[in-house]
């Protein structure tokens, strides 16, 4: 922010200058002196404060002009004013020059001043109101004491008949659209008119032009028009000076989320320009700057309350749908069914989208992240979710191959954690990747870069490429502990399964049958004894447990978890022709979490005393924590297609009460 400038005097002539309140004018009396001059005196209007600065020492000048000072190259004048002028050029400073012993001035130089107030203002203190001239408005800092304005990407669609998000064009069709934007006020105060040759200009840099847009409301009382003045091809806008005390209201929208090449910070400037002569560029004599940070996209972990549960209606999932509906009715959320005309045979709604939100002090709304997967559900987020106060964002790779790891069953987020004194109050994003140096599948770089650039939920890469589908939700999830600010990490465990089966075998239940009543699963009769005696299956699951333990160690380190924070759920996997794992029975960790109510894949485990021993075991682990276990039959509609309950559902949750700008990344 330019706060000091130099004005050059010329003996024998009158110089006019505009002074902006809060700045200082410097003028060199020595270089403006006529030949033979040795001393000078000063006269000035009462509205001007004049100081003679000699060798760094300042002396304030009274208005009568009797005192004289010796001319020297180290002598300058410092001028300031405290109030805006009511008339142009109404304040003046006169410098009289004298010969060494002369009593009458040999010449003089005059400076005629017009004082105005200019301030570009935003909500820099983040209280939802635009304050006046916050001294920290040009910078941006994190933390509860941080300063700096916040901008939302205007990625919802307030006008239903538009094909895309509101930020995709340069038009505003409603006041609702303006409410998504941050307010910016240009405050001016001064005489009815400025001296000739001055202009006030709003502008942005070329590098910010695709990241921010600014609108102005014309004729706010008679047939409002919303004028796009900055952004995209428009780098500057001349503001009409109206005189008196004025406030011009602008609305600012974000156009892009933070990304690999964009930190999220944008700046808007206002400059007062001075005209010199035709064909000579205007010169900036004052600049004020405001800085915004574009609000990041934030994921919501399982510990947050659910708002809506989404599930697809298929030809073969009527019973599954009914059980999910019964589960949802126990909670305070609503069930939203994606019917066949929209899902077009694609049941994997978890893989297509991830729900999150954006927030500023004045507003927030949910935003869905659309995966690069683009199955038959690809139109669902645009056609069914994007709307008023419901935003949309996507990232599509240009040259990378999209794999199963780009589906959002491979994108989860932890509850809030503190790791080695470093707080993650919004949790940490978890994505599955390939084993180091293996050259396997990995989530596409454009999505990873997007997640990293949001800054507030620092991602952790896990190892999921050992699985056929390769998603982190196949081996882990988080559950809240009702009534406490605690959670547990649930992990699939083949060793826990073998331990349970061996216990049941010792108790005399070795012939207990799995998949009882499901003749379509296999023509073979599968018992505990057969599983425990299958050496190849045992070896495979020992390898799979090593893969699980690798992830367990990463999660313990990156989330600062201890063994008491982790609950092992029995699981078995079998190796496919590519030596990757698929679930042997419905994978219970792939559950839906709705507060204390858990919708768990029904495992169809060995029947011990007419009860599934896997269900009994899991209830014994979770129900003492206050959680309610509902086992949902997904075996024919999801499990046989390599997915479970979590893969076939999606949950939009309430946002964090914690404000993201209060954290320090």
Curated annotation (Swiss-Prot):
<dbReference type="Pfam" id="PF03068">
    <property type="entry name" value="PAD"/>
</dbReference>
<comment type="similarity">
    <text>Belongs to the protein arginine deiminase family.</text>
</comment>
<feature type="binding site">
    <location>
        <position position="158"/>
    </location>
    <ligand>
        <name>Ca(2+) 2</name>
    </ligand>
</feature>
<feature type="binding site">
    <location>
        <position position="354"/>
    </location>
    <ligand>
        <name>Ca(2+) 5</name>
    </ligand>
</feature>
<dbReference type="GO" id="GO:0005634">
    <property type="term" value="C:nucleus"/>
</dbReference>
<dbReference type="GO" id="GO:1990830">
    <property type="term" value="P:cellular response to leukemia inhibitory factor"/>
</dbReference>
<feature type="binding site">
    <location>
        <position position="158"/>
    </location>
    <ligand>
        <name>Ca(2+) 3</name>
    </ligand>
</feature>
<dbReference type="Pfam" id="PF08527">
    <property type="entry name" value="PAD_M"/>
</dbReference>
<feature type="binding site">
    <location>
        <position position="408"/>
    </location>
    <ligand>
        <name>Ca(2+) 5</name>
    </ligand>
</feature>
<feature type="binding site">
    <location>
        <position position="125"/>
    </location>
    <ligand>
        <name>Ca(2+) 1</name>
    </ligand>
</feature>
<dbReference type="InterPro" id="IPR036556">
    <property type="entry name" value="PAD_central_sf"/>
</dbReference>
<dbReference type="GO" id="GO:0140798">
    <property type="term" value="F:histone H3R26 arginine deiminase activity"/>
</dbReference>
<dbReference type="GO" id="GO:0004668">
    <property type="term" value="F:protein-arginine deiminase activity"/>
</dbReference>
<dbReference type="GO" id="GO:0140794">
    <property type="term" value="F:histone arginine deiminase activity"/>
</dbReference>
<dbReference type="InterPro" id="IPR038685">
    <property type="entry name" value="PAD_N_sf"/>
</dbReference>
<feature type="active site" description="Nucleophile">
    <location>
        <position position="647"/>
    </location>
</feature>
<comment type="function">
    <text>Catalyzes the deimination of arginine residues of proteins.</text>
</comment>
<dbReference type="GO" id="GO:0030520">
    <property type="term" value="P:estrogen receptor signaling pathway"/>
</dbReference>
<dbReference type="GO" id="GO:1901624">
    <property type="term" value="P:negative regulation of lymphocyte chemotaxis"/>
</dbReference>
<dbReference type="InterPro" id="IPR008972">
    <property type="entry name" value="Cupredoxin"/>
</dbReference>
<dbReference type="InterPro" id="IPR013732">
    <property type="entry name" value="PAD_N"/>
</dbReference>
<feature type="binding site">
    <location>
        <position position="177"/>
    </location>
    <ligand>
        <name>Ca(2+) 2</name>
    </ligand>
</feature>
<feature type="binding site">
    <location>
        <position position="412"/>
    </location>
    <ligand>
        <name>Ca(2+) 5</name>
    </ligand>
</feature>
<dbReference type="GO" id="GO:0000791">
    <property type="term" value="C:euchromatin"/>
</dbReference>
<feature type="binding site">
    <location>
        <position position="411"/>
    </location>
    <ligand>
        <name>Ca(2+) 5</name>
    </ligand>
</feature>
<feature type="binding site">
    <location>
        <position position="154"/>
    </location>
    <ligand>
        <name>Ca(2+) 2</name>
    </ligand>
</feature>
<feature type="binding site">
    <location>
        <position position="171"/>
    </location>
    <ligand>
        <name>Ca(2+) 4</name>
    </ligand>
</feature>
<feature type="binding site">
    <location>
        <position position="127"/>
    </location>
    <ligand>
        <name>Ca(2+) 1</name>
    </ligand>
</feature>
<feature type="binding site">
    <location>
        <position position="123"/>
    </location>
    <ligand>
        <name>Ca(2+) 1</name>
    </ligand>
</feature>
<dbReference type="GO" id="GO:0005737">
    <property type="term" value="C:cytoplasm"/>
</dbReference>
<dbReference type="GO" id="GO:0042803">
    <property type="term" value="F:protein homodimerization activity"/>
</dbReference>
<dbReference type="Pfam" id="PF08526">
    <property type="entry name" value="PAD_N"/>
</dbReference>
<dbReference type="InterPro" id="IPR013733">
    <property type="entry name" value="Prot_Arg_deaminase_cen_dom"/>
</dbReference>
<feature type="binding site">
    <location>
        <position position="166"/>
    </location>
    <ligand>
        <name>Ca(2+) 2</name>
    </ligand>
</feature>
<keyword id="KW-0963">Cytoplasm</keyword>
<dbReference type="GO" id="GO:0070100">
    <property type="term" value="P:negative regulation of chemokine-mediated signaling pathway"/>
</dbReference>
<dbReference type="InterPro" id="IPR013530">
    <property type="entry name" value="PAD_C"/>
</dbReference>
<keyword id="KW-0378">Hydrolase</keyword>
<feature type="binding site">
    <location>
        <position position="180"/>
    </location>
    <ligand>
        <name>Ca(2+) 3</name>
    </ligand>
</feature>
<feature type="binding site">
    <location>
        <position position="180"/>
    </location>
    <ligand>
        <name>Ca(2+) 2</name>
    </ligand>
</feature>
<feature type="binding site">
    <location>
        <position position="156"/>
    </location>
    <ligand>
        <name>Ca(2+) 3</name>
    </ligand>
</feature>
<keyword id="KW-0479">Metal-binding</keyword>
